[in-house]
Amino acid sequence: MDAEIKTIDGGFCNSYLIGINGENILVDYGRHDKMQKALNGADISRVLLTHAHRENCADLWLFDREIVAFGDEYGILSDISGYWKKYGLVYESLGTPYVRPPIRQPSKVSKGENCSIAPLAAIGAPGHSPSHTVYLLDSGGVRYAFTGGLIYQGGKLPNLYDCEWDYGYMNGLFETVKSLRLLTACKPDILLPDRSGPILGGTGELAKFADRLDDFAHFLLRDYMASGNETQSFDSKSIDSGFLTKPAGVEGVDEISPNLLRVHKNYSNLYIVICEDHTAFLVDCWANGYSGSGNLPPFSEMMETLAKRYGIIKYRCVLLSHYHGDHLLNYDEMRKNFGAELWVYENMADVVENPFCYKFPATLPYYDRGENSGMSFFETKMPHTAVDRVLSDGEIFAIANHEIKAFHLPGQTDMGCGFYMELDGLRLAFTGDNIYYSPNEAVSGHDCFAVNNRALPEKEGYLKCARVLKELGPDRLMCGHSHIIDKPMPQILRLERFALDLIEKLREFSPETEYEWYADPFWATPEGQIIAKGERGCFVRVKLRNNSESPARFQGCICLPEGFRCFENGFDATLQAGGRLTLAFYVRAEKPVPPGIYPVTADIRRDGVDFGELFDHVICVEGAGFKSGYGL
């Protein structure tokens, strides 16, 4: 029997109404009021979900019908509160989740593997989500594929952040490629995505898109992986020792010049600059802070040994290259045992002090894993990190006899700072994690490109990094995770070429005219907060970013789980090109709620386009048995 297929504009997603064998089936479910109006009383037997991201199922708690989901999507949707309790611990990349489920429990969720959905067939197609599912239907001699977020019209990818399953290894994209090729073998004629028009010539379009996306994923790989020689980029002893450095007589420490030391182990460097007055300062501060960091001596013991060997009477401060916790792990020891201050760039100061407010990967609490791996980040036992001095772009400051320039140096992340100084006759730039030494002229040596780092290439990422370094023209780059790069200009130019190519590829795959929206998971995002024990409420900030070259209008509201209320939670703001705006909303528990983790989302329209509850964060309610160890 032939099916009748109707496309319903569900607001934040397409929903498809299939009438067949006397039964009405929906694929995905949009905004409830629009859906009910479009359905006009039709008797729906079940809803088949392609994935569990909110824009396809956020309002299903209002719809009393059987909901069918497969694999991990079922696991998430069948226990929403269980997912949120483990926020940042499951389906995450260095602590940043890559699934975006609803904040309220949908009704009647059934496990797809236990259901008969004939005459449709379900095909597992992970990538856009862990168990993304495509549904096939043969009708009237045509094979339809309901493809969810797998591919959009014009050979576009819905976004990058949902595919960011790891930190630079591109497994989410490679899984998407596998799914595209699997679906190609099913030979569909027409593809019906969840947020674009239909795609005709489905089999051919899938094959072309799979090849393009495979090339893109390989292009995005961190360059030490793409070159196929990880050791060459990471093994600090293999090239530097005897060439640019000599052993300092302490395990894991090299002397680069009379007044510059490097501690290196397990792919990470910290630098010690010695001053004329026998004091010293550090650039970054980790050497052996967590399990797996190698066999260096205990950190404080090592620093004391170096102080005696080099006549250092005081460690003044630590200059931080970027916010990632692996560059900060031993700072608490530096403060407690040596009195060293922490100096950071202005756009990372709050992230360092209040990491739980942000959905960035690799914040310091992430590294409190080991024996505490089952703990919420809010329960970390790591001490609070206080910033002593905030540096601005272009600021020149002195530490004893050394003059140092701090400058915004994004790349791997927007929240990066470079430090430039002349030392022992050389002009040095300390560059953090933005670039790796690469003798291979075919690659740039770029580090990870992760959109969750906030790293749009032109102003927040690798293009700005390359152009700042090109203008600076240092003799050497002192890198966070690789060899020293001597005479670095050829490699800086290769990094610039990579960044320009990256922008073109982002434009190629973006379903929006301005690629920045596609690669920015922070353009309308709430921030996490804590409701302290004995309190009933807190202020939740929502940050808006206009990535357009023209004004953009943002309309929306805060969405909360049951038991919470936000007074005057709506907003309507127009931002000029490149504008930024932070809004604050007071959220209150209507009655005492159990201690734990609770989600908060922002329901967003931009220039009249309905995006739904796109981005999220969490509120931590402290109480008996649950207290944040990393408080404000």
Please give the residue ranges for each predicted region.
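Conserved beta-strand hairpin/beta-sheet module of binuclear metal-dependent hydrolase folds
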Residues: M1-L39, V134-Y152, G252-K308, G418-Y437
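Metallo-beta-lactamase
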Residues: N24, N114, P119-K208, R212-F216, ...
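Active-site HxH/HxHxD metal-binding segment of metal-dependent hydrolases
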Residues: R31-C115, G289-S291, P297-I396
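Accessory terminal helices/loops
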Residues: L160-Y161, W165-N269, D277, L463-Q555, ...
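Short acidic, flexible loop segments centered on an aromatic residue
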Residues: S550-G563, D603-I604
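Short proline/glycine- and polar residue-rich coil/turn motifs
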Residues: A573-L581
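Short, surface-exposed loop/turn segments at beta-strand-coil junctions that are enriched for proline
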Residues: T574, R588-P594
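Terminal connector regions
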Residues: P592-S628
